[in-house]
A protein has these predicted regions:
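Acidic, divalent-metal-binding catalytic cores of TOPRIM
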Residues: 1-348
Length: 348
């Protein structure tokens, strides 16, 4: 006999909602890709709950550690989605592919699948306007040592032509010749001059231009399709100044923003400790204050994963709008009619 969980679908949840009574709040189960995603989606969905509806965020499998978009959108689960059961996933390149693959078609067209628009949750965590506050959270020092927004804007403008080529390679099946890893090897920041970031950008620009030239020679057919794709990406909401939000998330987190914040936070901590040493009246006070400060600060990577400063970003608001429309559709859809009893048998 099949497990109950295998028969669990949107209709089952809807029936359970009806059993709870007419005045009870409707529950919507939201499946996410992995436990790492639970906080992000729970925080987003919780703020959109209404007096009539609430969400419960779950993993797609309770009896295994399998995770990822393929599990969250598997045929077994996909057919079970509906007004009371949804899937919440990273967009990856599927949003930009606009239906070129089966997964992309599901992500872009299913009314019960919601995606991040940006590549992944890590991209939201690296949202440039929020990074200064992340440094404050990690170091308890509000001194602005580095302009994160300006740097990531310049970084994005520099990698933008190559990002379009990366999407092109996946859209037209040429990714074995130009994979996401190949893209990352060009755009990673190995060393950042915090005092002259323009030097780092110029080195990056030379690498990007060289790679673009090689791709143009390798794929001459791209002359007819590259520019239309670029215009399509712009219409989808990408801009040259925000291209970093659409590159692979863990590459951005681990290879660009994480190390960049690490260096800034280390300088901020040293600065705060110098202030403590300068202001301490005696050795005991110095040691007490240093100990208290070091106990109060936090690892920057932990703060980068926990902050919610991206909630004012345009892509995040688009996700919220999608959820609001889903809730409005649910209110407008009448519940299935209750089963009627069979008519009495006719008397002879």
């Amino acid at each position: 006999m099949k497990k109950l969980s295998q028969n669990l679908n949107s209709d089952f949840i809807s029936a359970a909602n009806r059993l709870a009574g007419r005045n009870a709040r409707r529950k919507v189960v939201a499946y996410v890709e992995s436990y790492d995603d639970v906080f992000f989606w729970s925080n987003l969905l919780r703020r959109l709950e209404t007096p009539d509806c609430y969400f419960e965020v779950m993993l797609p499998s309770r009896d295994s550690l399998c995770k990822g978009k393929k599990i969250a959108l598997s045929n077994r689960l996909g057919a079970r989605l509906g007004d009371s059961m949804i899937a919440c996933v990273d967009a990856d390149y599927d949003y930009l592919m606009q239906g070129a693959t089966e997964t992309s078609r599901t992500v872009c067209t299913s009314p019960y699948v919601f995606h991040t628009y940006v590549y992944a949750i890590e991209n939201y965590q690296c949202y440039a306007p929020a990074l200064h506050n992340v440094c404050v959270m990690a170091t308890l020092n509000d001194h602005r040592l580095f302009d994160f927004e300006a740097f990531l804007g310049d970084y994005s403008e520099t990698i933008w032509p190559l990002l379009v080529w990366s999407v092109w390679a996946y859209r037209y099946g040429r990714y074995p010749s130009f994979s996401l890893l190949d893209f990352y090897r060009v755009v990673q920041i190995e060393r950042l001059n915090y005092y002259h970031p323009e030097q780092t950008i110029e080195q990056l620009r030379r690498r990007v231009n060289a790679k673009v030239s090689r791709l143009q020679r390798l794929f001459p057919q791209g002359r007819q399709t590259y520019k239309p794709l670029r215009e399509e990406l712009l219409a989808l909401g990408l801009t040259p100044r925000t291209a970093y939000l659409y590159m692979r998330g863990h590459d951005l987190f681990d290879g660009v923003v994480g190390p960049m914040l690490g260096g800034v936070c280390e300088a901020l901590r040293r600065e705060r400790e110098r202030d403590i040493r300068r202001l301490a009246g005696h050795e005991v006070q110095l040691q007490n204050e240093l100990s208290a400060y070091r106990h109060a600060v936090a690892p920057v990577e932990e703060m980068l994963r926990k902050h919610t400063g991206y909630e004012n970003s345009e892509p995040y608001r688009r996700v919220q709008d999608d959820i609001r429309r889903f809730l409005e559709r649910g209110k407008a859809t009448p519940p299935p009619a209750a089963a009627r009893p069979a008519p009495p048998a006719a008397e002879d």
